[in-house]
Amino acid sequence: YQRKIRDTVGHGECIFGIFDDYPENPDFLERGELCRIEKLCVEWRWRLRGKAHRLCQVHGDFHPWNVMFREGTDFTVLDRSRGEWGEAADDLTAMAMNYIFYSVQKHGRLTGDLQEIFELFFENYLDKTHDDELQSVIAPFFAFRAAVVASPTWYPLLSGQTRRILFNFLWNVLRSESFDYLDVNSYLK
C-alpha cells in the first residue's frame, strides 16, 4: 500500500510523471503552480501511508475506454495497469473523473445525465462496499486523474478555460479533508 501511494504521487506514469510532460509555463496555470501541487501531494502521501488495511485488488486503469460491452450487461475489462494491488480509490476515480471531464467540456460544470451517473456510481460503490474511509483518502487519486485529462499532451484540443476548471477541481479536492461527491461543482470553482 505504501508503494502504491508513493507511486501515485511520484511515479513516472502518475502525478509527477504527468506533470513532467506539461509545458514549462502553460497559460492556464500560474507560475510555480505544479510545484505547489506536488508538495501538497507529498503531504497526502504521508497522510495515507499508514492505511495498509485498504490494500485491495485493483485494475489500475479502470476508465470507459478499457470496458468493452457485449450484449446486455456482459462486459470485459481490458488493460490492467500498474500492478494488481493498490487502493480502490484509484479505480473509482479513473472511471468517475470521466463523468466530470466530459460534462466540464460541454457545460463548464457537472450537470445533467453525467452528474446523475456520477452520483449513482459513487452511491453504488459506497452501498456495496461500506467503505467509510473512501472520501477521506480519494484526493490524490482524483488529482492524478485530473492531471491526466487536463494534460496538453493527452488532450491537446481542450480550451484553457476547461483546463483551469479541471485544475480548480484538483486543487480543491487536495485541500479538502473529505470529498463530497454530491457537491462536485463546489470543487470546480
Protein language model annotation of sequence segments:
Residues 89-129, 143-161:
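Active-site activation/catalytic loop segments of kinase-like enzymes and analogous catalytic loops
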Residues 32-40, 112-121, 162-173:
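Extended, well-ordered alpha-helical scaffold segments
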Residues 130-142:
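All-alpha amphipathic helical-bundle segments outside canonical DNA-binding/catalytic cores
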Residues 42-90:
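Active-site acidic catalytic loop and adjacent metal/ATP-binding pocket
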Residues 1-47, 151:
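Active-site catalytic-loop/activation-segment of kinase and kinase-like phosphoryl-transfer enzymes
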Residues 9, 24-35, 108-112, 137, ...:
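Charge-dense, low-complexity intrinsically disordered segments
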